[in-house]
């Protein structure tokens, strides 16, 4: 799959049967439809019934990047519960694009308040993506 930003080939990283497409050049992440819900479910087993519709806002307008699957221009949407993050989403529902660091921010935002969250996925993402660039794990 090609990166929507720089058109470079992305690598596929798999964790707990969730495929994450990662661009080595810009550090962006593509999640196919349904994969964000799977990541949220891994983070918070009790909140696994959380639906993506609860986290999405209405589109904030059309973005300039195209979906790597269907080539339609993606919509800009706000994602999250509190401190929302502006991401790109395919208008046909193929998936979502996260610029460098945005996926980790969204996942941290979705951690349950006051409960020890399973941060394995966030730690894995940070370590895997930083390792591909030879960076240390400071964050």
List each model region and its residues.
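Residues immediately within or flanking Cys/His clusters that coordinate Zn2+
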Residues: 20, 28, 64, 87, ...
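Short Cys/His-rich Zn2+-coordinating modules
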Residues: 4-10, 44-55, 71-76
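Short, intrinsically disordered terminal segments enriched in charged and Pro/Gly residues
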Residues: 38-57, 107-139
């Amino acid at each position: 799959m090609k990166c929507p930003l720089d058109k470079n080939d992305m690598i596929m990283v798999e964790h707990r049967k969730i495929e994450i497409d990662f661009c080595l050049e810009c550090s962006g992440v593509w999640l196919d439809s349904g994969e964000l819900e799977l990541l949220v479910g891994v983070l918070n087993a009790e909140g696994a019934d959380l639906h993506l519709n609860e986290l999405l806002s209405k589109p904030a307008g059309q973005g300039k990047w195209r979906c790597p699957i269907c080539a339609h221009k993606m919509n800009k949407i706000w994602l999250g519960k509190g401190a929302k993050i502006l991401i790109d989403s395919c208008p046909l529902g193929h998936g979502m694009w996260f610029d460098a660091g945005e996926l980790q921010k969204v996942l941290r935002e979705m951690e349950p308040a006051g409960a020890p969250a399973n941060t394995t996925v966030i730690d894995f993402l940070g370590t895997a993506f930083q390792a591909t660039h030879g960076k240390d794990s400071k964050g």
